[in-house]
Amino acid sequence: MKKRILMIAALAVLAAGCAELLKVLETVAPAALTEQEVISGLKEALITGAKNSAGRLSLTDGYYSDLAIKVLLPEEAKVIVDNISKIPGGDKLVEDVIIRINRAAEDAAKEVAPVFVSAVTQMTIADGFNILRGEDNAATQYLHSTTYNELYSLYKPKIAVSTEKKIIAGISTKESWETLTGKWNSFAGTLAGRLAGFNTVNTEIDDYLTKKALDGLFMKIAEEELKIRKDVSARVTPLLQKVFGSLDAK
């Protein structure tokens, strides 16, 4: 009888302990993420990343001083740079073009954030969960694959406006590029130029600049995404903390 009483008492204590433990777990364990929270959190992350990236790139030297995304002359123009000393004033002309190209990209970056804000509204619930559980740059890859063409068509006209702006001595980026390539093509097209194996340069500057600027932008957004995924301090809102915090223990 005594043993039975002791056993019953022990079970009662154990049951009480389990009940208390469950209460504690309910208090500290995060609630399961809802579909709406996942979608809202990812949209918030993309918008935050886009705004942060575009904000930095739109500053003076945002592109020019960042060696990872600095927009240089097209590969087709390498021969110009390599042989620029043969053209009077060529060194300064090349640097002026590079500066103006990057200024154009910085100017266009001011308009990028609203484009991304509009684009992320198309994200579905399935997309959201795939991105949340995907690679560290899954959101950036999704955004690139689903919006690049639209962003290009929206971004290129802004680039064109920027390259046509008069910046230094009343000369635009496009005019500087055309002057540079025009001088080179005049030489490359001569008999001496052809015998030397030089080719003319026919790169369309607005197309080239748009692609390079967007590549740089997506690179920076990928960096922002990685911060939000890995760095708790980068999750600047409660929703970001909850959505991406669910990945920390995995």
Where are these regions (language model features)?
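Positively charged n-region of N-terminal signal peptides that target proteins for export
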Residues: M1-R4
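C-terminal motif of bacterial Sec signal peptides marking the signal peptidase cleavage site
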Residues: L14-G17
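Bacterial signal peptide processing site
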Residues: A19-L22
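Post-signal-peptide N-terminal segment of Sec-exported extracytoplasmic proteins
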Residues: V24-E26, A31-L72
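Signal peptide-directed extracytoplasmic domains
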Residues: S58-R103, P114
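Mid-length scaffold segments of soluble, non-membrane domains
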Residues: E95-K165
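A structured, mid-to-C-terminal "fold-capping" secondary-structure block
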Residues: A169-P238
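Non-transmembrane, aqueous-exposed alpha-helical and coiled segments at domain scale
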Residues: L247-K250
